[in-house]
Amino acid sequence: MTAPKSEFLAVVRDRGFIHQCTDLDGLDALLAKGPVSAYIGFDCTADSLHVGSLIQIMLLHWLQRTGHRPVVLMGGGTTRIGDPSFRDEARPLLTDEKIGQNMAGIRQVFSRFLSFGEGATDAVMVNNADWLDGLAYIPFLRDFGRHFSVNRMLTFDSVRLRLDREQPLSFLEFNYMILQAYDFLELGRRTGVRLQMGGSDQWGNIVNGVELGRRVDGLELFGLTSPLITTASGAKMGKTAQGAVWLNEARLPAYDYWQFWRNTEDADVGRFLRLFTDLPLDEVARLEALGGAEINEAKKILAERATTMAHGPEAALTAAETARKVFEQGGTGDALPTHDVAAEALAAGLPLAEMMRATGLAASGKEVKRLVSEGGARINDVAVSDAARLLGPADVQDGAIKLSAGKKRHALIRVLPG
């Protein structure tokens, strides 16, 4: 497209957020006229979102920053079914109680990125259970089922992948596409939403919603998707060998979150600064051009800005100071992940492998053995030569034992008084 007239599309284009759009010129014209309401849906399959959802959160962040209204759709209803998009198997079904708990945890994430309220551009959060729970099956099929072509739905990549692999796709999951399309229609009626955004895996679902709104209510709706984000080495964004990189501190300490960004591959620094921080693009260009050891300063800025957005400036500052103590001074810092043990248990001897797993430094005893054999397992900065080693009172320094896995991952065993 030519240079966008709307600030939102100009920002997200320049920062690398756009993958596909149903009508880019039409959307640009609409956004240029004044505030537009747009939404992204999030299913409640866990009590936190992880970094894999961050590009969608940042889209909503920039939408609000450029004068529009973000609508966060919580999938309290559709989570009971599960989105089959590009999954090898069905998701386990969750109870209503668990879905409610997960929604409460996810709500905490958005308060860092969006401003909620009653104003024209203040963010709102809605739950699709509010309208899906009351649907009557026969009237719903009569009024809306006729607008969906099964032939076409079978051509969507998300469905074809499962069928080509001869993996079962239940009727329950197949209905997810219809319900997501209905969400778009219902939000258009209730909140005036005109745009749905999402990841590239949601393209088929979004297009269904755009067409349903046009056929049923004559609405002019739009869809915009972001690209799948992978690292320079090809790894999927949001996952590490140690598990998901969660956005809630109850799931992942702010220090670990800071460290995740600090460990970004050199080739990804500029792209991640554009996508996951609000740094001006001229500053991003300057940092991206740094070479050699100087790129580490850019990584620290990436870690600081990303952690500030997710956890606040105080948590980011504490994490940076902890990292400085750990890596520059050899200290322990105050924000490292901790695991508490009783003094009596320590006196009896605690297996190193068990403590490495408890602190998240290793996923299994096999991984502990590998770390020991490679010289990567350390107690108080001293390499361990025996994977069967027991921790005892003699290892305690200043009330804690520092464990390390490699040069960049550390945790504390904190001893509770007897």
UniProtKB/Swiss-Prot annotation:
A motif ('KMSKS' region) lies at residues 236-240. L-tyrosine binds at Y39, Y176, Q180. GO terms for molecular function: ATP binding; RNA binding; tyrosine-tRNA ligase activity. It comes from the Bacteria. InterPro entries: aa-tRNA-synth_Ic (IPR002305), Rossmann-like_a/b/a_fold (IPR014729), S4_RNA-bd_sf (IPR036986), Tyr-tRNA-ligase (IPR002307), Tyr-tRNA-ligase_bac-type (IPR024088), Tyr-tRNA-ligase_bac_1 (IPR024107). It is found in: Cytoplasm. Its EC number is 6.1.1.1. It catalyses: tRNA(Tyr) + L-tyrosine + ATP = L-tyrosyl-tRNA(Tyr) + AMP + diphosphate + H(+). GO terms for cellular component: cytosol. ATP binds at K239. GO terms for biological process: tyrosyl-tRNA aminoacylation. Gene3D superfamilies: HUPs, RNA-binding S4 domain, Tyrosyl-Transfer RNA Synthetase. Keywords: Aminoacyl-tRNA synthetase, ATP-binding, Cytoplasm, Ligase, Nucleotide-binding, Protein biosynthesis, RNA-binding. Its main location: cytoplasm. A motif ('HIGH' region) lies at residues 44-53. Residues 350-416 form the S4 RNA-binding domain. Belongs to the class-I aminoacyl-tRNA synthetase family. TyrS type 1 subfamily. Homodimer. Catalyzes the attachment of tyrosine to tRNA(Tyr) in a two-step reaction: tyrosine is first activated by ATP to form Tyr-AMP and then transferred to the acceptor end of tRNA(Tyr). This is Tyrosine--tRNA ligase. It comes from Rhodospirillum rubrum (strain ATCC 11170 / ATH 1.1.1 / DSM 467 / LMG 4362 / NCIMB 8255 / S1). The gene is tyrS.
